[in-house]
Design a protein with these regions (language model features):
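Short acidic, glycine/serine/threonine-rich loops at helix termini
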Residues: 12-18, 41-45, 88-93, 160-166, ...
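Membrane-embedded hairpin module used as a gating/binding unit in multi-pass transport
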Residues: 121-206
């Protein structure tokens, strides 16, 4: 049986399953529903949350997981995944695959909000963050007797071809630590000064929503200069949330900065936002807080819709004439008229940081 670690994302389609897993029968894939398929197996106490967040968070977190993980009929649970910089936890994978990938709403929502309150730029690219400590606690206390084997990779994709640099297999935290050390070396790209204009291509087969497309914001924000510009070439983006409920919240509240979103979140009248901390955290992560401009170049959603959530909008077909991803090279490019841009063909595979600020 295959249980894709989808979190709140859309289920894996038959086409995606075939592309990723070859000829494994589609009926072997079990879609995880983060609202209905979980059981509560424990709790991370409020006192521990206060300790690891320096007093910024005061509520406990329920530990919920897909009931199949607890099913004794399975004598081996293999959890494969790629370790890369991640906006919510610092470095992706390992126990995140379990507690978010096939976890429940309380853990997904609160872990995202803890990360947003603590500060994304304090965590990205690092181990032992508050969010990672939540998952470490839950794994050690509530899943220690389950037969879970982690299979972690570290990859890059120069020229669009995936190169695997490391494969780490085991049932301890050491496999994560070794993978993180290599991923920090391979997946963090330092620039010597702040980037004035960053152009990021979002592959339409992978990025169909701003929920996913905003990875370009998270991964470049530590490299973009004050007053700079981020332009996302987003031919596949046709909606905001992967989930219809989240899509509605993004359209209602928009990406309008950390302070504004926290004020909206704390307003008792906004119960819909208060009930979805993951969405609130996403709205915080997706804003530059006015430090640089964010523009989506789109073709499958109207410019008015994009502007309605607080981003700038441009026409994809117009922008791609000037910034053709087929002709641009990764890194700095100088255009015929002298404009200098920094081009990233896939934001998912790295983290870009201005060395002056790290």
């Amino acid at each position: 049986d295959i249980l894709p670690a989808r979190g709140t994302h859309e289920p894996v389609s038959q086409e995606q399953a075939a592309a990723m897993f070859g000829d494994i029968p589609y009926e072997k894939f079990i879609p995880h529903n983060w609202r209905t398929d979980v059981v509560k197996i424990g709790e991370v106490p409020a006192s521990y949350l206060e300790e690891i967040t320096e007093g910024l968070w005061h509520d406990p977190v329920s530990v919920e997981i897909n009931r199949l993980i607890m099913d004794e009929k399975y004598d081996l649970i293999i959890s494969p995944g790629q370790v890369v910089p991640h906006e919510v936890i610092g470095m992706a994978n390992h126990s995140k695959n379990l507690f978010v990938g096939v976890g429940g709403s309380d853990m997904i929502n609160k872990s995202h909000m803890v990360g947003a309150v603590y500060g994304m730029e304090r965590m990205m690219g690092k181990d032992h963050t508050p969010v990672r400590k939540i998952f470490d606690y839950a794994l050690a206390k509530y899943l220690k007797d389950r037969p879970i084997l982690f299979v972690l990779t570290v990859t890059t994709a120069p020229g669009g071809k995936i190169h695997t640099h490391g494969l780490f297999i085991g049932d301890t935290r050491l496999v994560l630590e070794k993978a993180i050390a290599l991923a920090q070396e391979k997946n963090i790209d330092f620039v010597e000064t702040g980037i004035k204009k960053c152009v990021v291509y979002l592959d339409p087969s992978e990025f169909k929503s701003t929920w996913l497309g905003n990875k370009a914001v998270y991964r470049t924000r530590m490299a973009i200069a004050d007053g700079g510009e981020l332009l996302m070439l987003a031919p596949g983006v046709s909606k905001f949330g992967e989930d219809a409920q989240v899509d509605k919240l993004i359209r209602k509240y928009g990406y309008r900065g950390r302070i504004h979103t926290l004020e909206e979140f704390e307003n008792p009248e906004n119960q819909d936002l208060r009930d979805n901390m993951g969405a609130a955290a996403h709205l915080i992560h997706g804003s530059s807080d006015g430090r640089f401009t964010i523009t989506y170049a789109v073709k499958n959603i109207t410019k008015e819709e994009i502007e309605g959530v607080g981003f700038n909008a441009a026409d994809y077909d117009e922008m791609v004439k000037r910034y053709d991803p087929e002709k641009l090279s990764y890194g700095y490019n100088t255009l015929p008229d002298g404009e200098e841009i920094y081009f990233i063909p896939n934001p998912a595979l790295g983290l870009w940081i201005n060395r002056e600020k790290f």
